[in-house]
């Protein structure tokens, strides 16, 4: 190219352009790596280009050296190369074709299109590189797949050769076609479009979105339409040219339609304003007309759909006139067309007179051959087959197809053809019957077709081939009832054959009511809902409207529950007033029993139960949903008329008597159904009507009875909230008159003036705990001196469940000398041992002496309950369960003042004091897993007591279930126990070293006492704290210290199985009143004693109950020593056959009481308690623990770690407030759970809400003067203290005697 450089770089002499007469426009071109500038006219104008690049230029302009240089780029020939190159040059410049065009012409097009522009050349090179890389990658993938296929094929061949001999032929597996990503993407797009189309059809939306107009959005054919074989071309006369285009049914596939769309898009791009391509003025009806006309493939496509019926009738008349002249010709044509091979061409040319007949009549008779089976099992099958072929069809189209079928000769071969003269008139009733819109359909009927209101077309649901027998049976049923239905339709002025006649005809039109009309209606509505169990007649606007009773209300005594909250209804309405009942009344008030949804909404707005700020949109939305629900009821009261677009009230012909008769039948059916669902209860169980166990007061007179609902005969009874001063719920066992017991006086009393009684409650339940195994070494027991705190003990026994023992300690009872001569079993003094101190958040407060009531379930061994009176340094409450010991005790016969029956008051007051006196509950929960082993030690593997402070474990709703007996079951899982461990709690571990020295394990029991002290304790104040391994290094001032000390009790050698129970529920309340003997340093303390020894005890000749009060010196670090009052109660087992009731009154001194019994029953005594300590935390209200019995799980082997199940009868409403509500301080926003499940949490605000709603009439908040609460203080305060008082006052009922 060096010889051509001067030609390419020197400017061309184009004239006097340099003088300003013209301007050159040059363009850069990249030719083989050389960048040149060429005039733009040379590149764009072909004439200029070929004038420059021509044969004359080659011969005259170029020199010999230049021509030789250019000839090097020409092909080299072996012979006569120079001559052949010259011939090639001549052919090149003359424009001859070189198989793929002339290179000069191709170069001119490339210059003109800008392919030699430097930027274009650069990107073309990059594109070529990318394509080459893609090619290499595809080759690698191809060879990789090929290699895998070869290896797999080789392994298959080797395996086949190994299994079979060489004589057997090999069967090659054809590999399944792999799904490429492009194919998967296409299939995904098709699936998406199919789902989108079905959703749009379901919603009735026909508008096209922007993505549906894309090329890839063409939808496939409907899946409900089976692919029919290609229809052969019909034979028509050659002279009939007008019908050729519509007579042949064109089958277009997806590919054809996509090509058509692509061409349309191309035309729109090039000619956007062309009138034939503008689709903005097209409507959906136009498209439907075109699609339906082309789909039918008949002559009706040329006519307007509006006059289709008229044309069909004209064809019918024409057939009747010409049927004789063309009958033979039609039969000749029908026979060959019925075969699949088609029709032979006509050999004779038709005469001019026969042309009209041949042109029209054979075509009419051939219509039924197009996809319709002329012989069907029923008319319903014929209709469904037409719908299956058409996918969707309008009513005129279906009538036309049925008319064509009826005019065919083969239609008369059907056995049911003669049942109706004109089947085309029965198309609409048959479709309505198949859609389930007729009243004559069976109850188990499922619709076969549905009507699309948006498109006004009928659509097939499912496949009819699978239901031929069912369709035939339905068709026979329909034939029997259609005559009556159509007679009714002719008499009525309605399109629906099942619509009843209105009772009263009126010409009233629904309009907004005036104030007077609304007032009159609301007065009638108020009277109507005052007796919801009866029918009612509204008399408005000059006509009457009868409405039936409210659904589900069968008597006048309606439920006292509050109505469910609704955004559109008032909250103070009756519970049975719902949107459904109001809409039912509004539909009944429609004039003539029919109207639109807007009219129903207008009538509904007159109701007094609607909220005042309800908008018309909200009413319309709610009425729409309510009408749908009423439409699908078992006995529907409304129905939608598709043709007239009206809602019809179906019960408009019923009277009040008929309504009430149907309502009574429904009530009887509901009662019978409820009776079948309820399982019969065992005869040993008695259930109270109010879901609360009835509580009776024991007296010294005639015997009274108590009853209680038991979940199982082997389970302890479910105690209810104790009602002071009555006894807890007991099994229905006759109770003998209470004998008199002697009271031993064992020490002086420090209480010199009776105090006002305000009993706290000790709620004791029995959770599941494993056995402890053998006993420890013996230890000497000591009897501690005690001062008298009078106790009244009442004991029962029964065979159906566990007995209950109530211990009430009151300092106001006088002392009685002991009358028994037998020895008394008292609570021994605990020996010194290792102690564990657990600080809790509590400070010193001034708490008055307390009255403690304990409820303990009793089984077959002795249980001791110790109540310690408060002293300066400690508030003691000890509940001890001891093994039974044989002791010869005589039965006392003397009476005492304590034998009188308590008062019949049924109010239980649990006071939680704010301000300076706050009762704080610390719940102790946990499990003890023990494996019995031989030796002198007790291996406590999982002995963890968790002391829970202010936090309360929230139970998930899934843990509250109802068993088969109708009782609420609260399941505590190990996960919930783990949740307790994550809280801010302190763990007290009872280890092996805690229980003293080893020894003989066959005759000793074990007890652990937790002492809760309210005063400050420092590290150097008590020697017991030094032995505590788990206590914190420092104890803050004002904390409560929990001390755990071991205590050994003697037991029987034969008692080998024992069960240790954790603390569950004890609460203590302050006692109101004044006391003269108390100091400002007197502090109450709570002590919990958990004793092993609750095992299966053998029968003994006699058992002993000992109530002893003795004085014990309490450790007072800050204020010096003081006296602690302790009451020890030992409870024996009773014989089930001999019921005994003991009422004991003790004076101010220690008085042991002994009771002898007969042969005891072998039972177990589960014991559980809860610590209640005092603190200054001013949060209100505190927690009230629900008394629920804890059922023991069956033991599996010798090592048991099971989760306890708490069962109790929880009321369906909040009338039994004390049984199913836990009062605790919760954060704002805590929801109140009502219903069958117990309310878990309740704040003071929610308690007030309950009162306002009428759900908790037995709850009140009182303000108690502080003078009633400062019972042990030297100087009383007149400051009022707010107190929460929760009372439950069920009326005591006489329990029936259990047989």
Curated annotation (Swiss-Prot):
Belongs to the NFRKB family. One of its GO terms (molecular function) is protease binding. Residues 39-156 form the DEUBAD domain. It is found in: Nucleus. Residues 163-187, 204-232, 669-760, 882-902, 1017-1043 are annotated as: Disordered. There is a cross-link at residues 327, 469, 488 (Glycyl lysine isopeptide (Lys-Gly) (interchain with G-Cter in SUMO2)). Component of the chromatin remodeling INO80 complex; specifically part of a complex module associated with the N-terminus of INO80. Interacts with UCHL5; NFRKB competes with ADRM1 for interaction with UCHL5. GO terms for biological process: chromatin remodeling; DNA recombination; DNA repair; positive regulation of DNA repair; positive regulation of DNA-templated transcription; positive regulation of telomere maintenance in response to DNA damage; regulation of cell cycle; regulation of chromosome organization. It comes from Homo sapiens. The modification Phosphoserine is found at residues 228, 298, 351, 1022, 1291. The keyword Endoplasmic reticulum does not apply. This is Nuclear factor related to kappa-B-binding protein. NFRKB seems to be mostly disordered. The wing-helix like domain doesn't bind DNA. Expressed in thymus, brain, testes, spleen and liver. There is a cross-link at residue 488 (Glycyl lysine isopeptide (Lys-Gly) (interchain with G-Cter in SUMO1)). Keywords: Acetylation, DNA damage, DNA recombination, DNA repair, DNA-binding, Isopeptide bond, Nucleus, Phosphoprotein, Transcription, Transcription regulation, Ubl conjugation. Pfam families: NFRKB_winged. Its main location: nucleus. Residues 216-232, 677-688, 695-715, 723-733, 892-902, 1019-1043 have a biased composition (Low complexity). The modification N6-acetyllysine is found at residue 1237.
